[in-house]
């Protein structure tokens, strides 16, 4: 069995907020830091409210993520979805959101 250790996104750079799950403004810099560690991955996340600045939501952003992942020799992407924490799973809007997220993740 192979055990992997990673870190949640936003823990390797400073944020201007006391919010625990705040998407980092300069997310790509975290890959520079992870190269200096023996960590296996950075766990991306979505926030409780839709954040269009998160690169997971655009094809161009996904290309940037893939490029950064390959530069640190990581082979996979791990995502934690926080949107469903504050949005009911039985709502149509949440269903649409989750379908969009799944469609975006298929680009990896």
Predicted regions and their residues:
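N-terminal pre-domain/capping segments
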Residues: 1-106
